[in-house]
């Protein structure tokens, strides 16, 4: 440990020489976090957390504030970039067995939950139609809690419906949570450098380590530059690509949109929620879709850490990726046939991965022992 700290102080953080591009998403997430905090701060200067003024204040930012449209679009597209990076980051963790570093994995899942809460609160702030109705639907899930549900919902809303107090507290939460994310990120990175990164074969890197700078820092810069280029391409040519058309109308509690849905990065969880025709069951499945990630370090049965040399588990992993994409797609569709059955089947497949992963690990161990 002491040697690692000396190397760290000498700007020579030792990192395995064979980590691939999939390990670059951590630095990309850090870039997203810095950008979201900065653009969010500039937006907060001009934003007004009042149900009568919120929508107008966002229009004022995009029309009248110098470069306000840039800040607003960067913040909106940046959120999508953040989630693309975090989902790839988690997928890499599952594929290469990074979750066996338990402290790092569990702090990472805590970060994901905090990030999802932050994004949800942020989505409500423009006070557009979809903002309002998505907030109504999601916060209403609290009523599914036996005995305490209604009291908790009223407490969260600050009244008997979503109103001015709700928007004010959501803005306060959206402002404070990024600083909690920054703190958790620091803990996540400190815990990571306690043991160091894993690598594609899942072996010990101690025999072959190189300084982080200049080797991996330049490699990180390439991917960060690619991400920023993509961000500015979307900003310049199609800034509303990821926005919901309903959000261009001011929130109206009297008119319900035809199809209420959250932002695209929550659709996989929303698809799982919708596929269960029971409020409490759906809410539990929604929570479990994220919480189940915490089980992976404790259900690992394979002798090898990574999936690199485990073809059976690889098939299972890519099924999970296909399931995630299919769930996202079906959640954009109305609740009718055949989308109901597709959602239900893919929801089963999603949880099936976490049940089958330890079983397949054990099976592969048996196959390896037979070959010996």
Swiss-Prot record:
Keywords: Electron transport, Heme, Iron, Membrane, Metal-binding, Mitochondrion, Mitochondrion inner membrane, Respiratory chain, Transmembrane, Transmembrane helix, Transport, Ubiquinone. One of its GO terms (cellular component) is respiratory chain complex III. It is found in: Mitochondrion inner membrane. Belongs to the cytochrome b family. The keyword Heme applies. It comes from the Eukaryota. The cytochrome bc1 complex contains 3 respiratory subunits (MT-CYB, CYC1 and UQCRFS1), 2 core proteins (UQCRC1 and UQCRC2) and probably 6 low-molecular weight proteins. This is Cytochrome b. Heme b b566 binds at residues 89, 188. Binds 2 heme b groups non-covalently. A ubiquinone binds at residue 193. It is a multi-pass membrane protein. The chain crosses the membrane at residues 25-45, 69-90, 105-125, 170-190, 218-238, 280-300, 312-332, 339-358. Component of the ubiquinol-cytochrome c reductase complex (complex III or cytochrome b-c1 complex) that is part of the mitochondrial respiratory chain. The b-c1 complex mediates electron transfer from ubiquinol to cytochrome c. Contributes to the generation of a proton gradient across the mitochondrial membrane that is then used for ATP synthesis.
């Amino acid at each position: 440990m002491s040697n690692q700290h000396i190397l760290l102080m000498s700007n020579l953080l030792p990192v395995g020489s064979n980590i691939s591009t999939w390990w670059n998403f951590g630095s990309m997430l850090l870039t997203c976090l810095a950008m979201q905090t900065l653009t969010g701060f500039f937006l907060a200067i001009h934003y007004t957390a009042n149900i009568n003024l919120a929508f107008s204040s966002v229009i004022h930012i995009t029309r009248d504030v110098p470069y306000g449209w840039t800040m607003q679009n960067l913040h909106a597209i940046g959120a999508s970039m953040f989630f693309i990076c975090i989902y790839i980051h988690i997928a890499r963790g599952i594929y290469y067995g990074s979750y066996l570093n338990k402290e790092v994995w569990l702090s990472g899942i805590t970060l994901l939950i905090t990030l999802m809460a932050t994004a949800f609160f942020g989505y409500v702030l423009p006070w557009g139609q979809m903002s309002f109705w998505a907030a109504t639907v999601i916060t209403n899930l609290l009523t599914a809690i036996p005995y305490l549900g209604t009291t908790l919902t009223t407490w969260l809303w600050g009244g008997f419906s979503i109103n001015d107090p709700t928007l004010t507290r959501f803005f306060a939460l959206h402002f404070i949570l990024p600083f909690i994310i920054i703190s958790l990120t620091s803990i996540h990175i400190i815990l990571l450098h306690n043991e160091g990164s894993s690598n594609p074969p899942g072996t010990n890197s101690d025999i072959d380590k190189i300084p982080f700078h200049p080797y991996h820092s330049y490699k990180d810069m390439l991917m960060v530059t690619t991400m920023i280029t993509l961000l500015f391409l979307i900003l310049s040519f199609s800034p509303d690509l990821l926005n919901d058309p309903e959000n261009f109308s001011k929130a109206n509690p009297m008119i319900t949109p035809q199809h209420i849905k959250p932002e695209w990065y929550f659709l996989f969880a929303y698809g799982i929620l919708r596929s269960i025709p029971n409020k409490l069951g759906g809410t539990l499945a929604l929570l479990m879709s994220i919480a189940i990630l915490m089980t992976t370090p404790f259900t690992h049965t394979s002798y090898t850490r990574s999936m690199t040399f485990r073809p059976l588990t690889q098939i299972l992993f890519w099924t999970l990726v296909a399931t995630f994409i299919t769930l996202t797609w079906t959640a954009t569709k109305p609740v009718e046939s055949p989308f109901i059955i597709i959602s239900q089947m893919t929801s089963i497949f999603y949880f099936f991965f976490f049940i089958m992963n330890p079983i397949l690990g054990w099976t592969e161990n048996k196959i390896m022992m037979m070959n010996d």
